[in-house]
Amino acid sequence: MTSTVISNRSKKPEVYTDSKYDFLYPHVDDPNFNVKIAQKKEFSETQYDGHIDTEMTIEEQAEKMCKSDFELAPHQLFVRNFLSFNTPYNSLLLYHGLGTGKTCSAITIAEEMREYLNQLGVSQRILVVASPNVQDNFKMQLFDESKLELENGFWKMNTCVGYKLLREVNPTNMKNMDRRKIVSQIRRIIAGSYLFLGYREFN
């Protein structure tokens, strides 16, 4: 006697149109996916307001942006929220031009994952599969020691991970910590949390 298991993966998922299901996250095959997802609080808050300050000249605007601390752009916040553990979504293809923040978006997601794994006590490393150039860029944006600055006895770092790594190596916020110690501890955290592989390793 033989038994056959039929996978239901090929079946079209049921798309709920009744308003009583509005609290659910929409299915990715829902024809109104973009409208429904934009209505969720964590995504509606990441919309661009479209406001351009016409009172400032281009030079003044550039000066203001260069002197401000790093902030995730709305589209980067959207990506982070989309792939958080609060949603049912577990994959996303980021496709855009150069310099639009794809690497920083990926780092933000990876750091959320790393924090979650640490809370669970899981020591599994995050896998980054990319070409050598992309790996170098990822590592540089994750931690660039040239961006470490001492201000009033405290180290700060203006990058897409913000103060996250600094808080891990200095949870008690001690003043005047040795720079070399901070750099070595952050490098140790990254080496223990990330595994960088090229495409050839999968041949």
Regions found by a protein language model. Give the residues of each.
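SF2 helicase/translocase NTPase motor core
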Residues: 2-79, 87-93, 100-203
